[in-house]
Structure formats: C-alpha cells, structure tokens
Amino acid sequence: ALIRTAVRVGAIVGGADKREMQDLTEYGEKIGLAFQITDDLLDLLGDEKRLGKQVGSDLKKGEKTYPAAYGIQESKNRARELMESALDALSRFDDRADPLREIARYMVERIN
C-alpha cells in the first residue's frame, strides 16, 4: 500500500487524468507486491552484509512470507510476473515513465 500511495501522490501532483491514475495505481499495486516478495526472498537468499540484517530472520520470527508458502522458484516467478504487469500498466506512457520502469526492474532484479 505504501508504494501504491506514493505513486498515486506523484500522479496527483503531476496532474494525471483518470485513466493515467488508474494505470499508475495498477503499477503501484503490482510493483509493491513484487517488492514485498523480493524482500522476502532476500531475507532467505541475500547477503547479510548487504542486507544489514541476519538472513532468515523472517523465518526465525515465524513470519508468513510468500517463499514460505509457495517456495523460492515460484516466488521468483511471481515477482517477475508482477514486474511485467507493472511495466504493462505503463504502456500508454512515453519516456516520462522511464524512471518508474527502472525502479520496477531494480526492485525485482536486486535478488540476482
């Protein structure tokens, strides 16, 4: 919800019309979920020095995560699908949306 809200605020400030607001809201929802799944994956697979926290801390705390429910590969696949859907939501926009496209790719590809 935080990423979606940030994107919506930017759209409002930028003067988005109704259709653009819908597209940007969809982008924010999709990339927000992709970010969370990727964050859950990083908690399992990431480098502790880069993360700044102990790997596996979510698991140790008993937190419910996408990888715990669906497995690592399915989680990677789902994060990528969500990223692609987020990028598709930007298809009506020109290069003004390139920073959003770059952010979407970074959020998901940081696991690799």
Model-derived features: where do they sit?
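All-alpha prenyltransferase/terpene-synthase fold signal
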Residues: 1-112
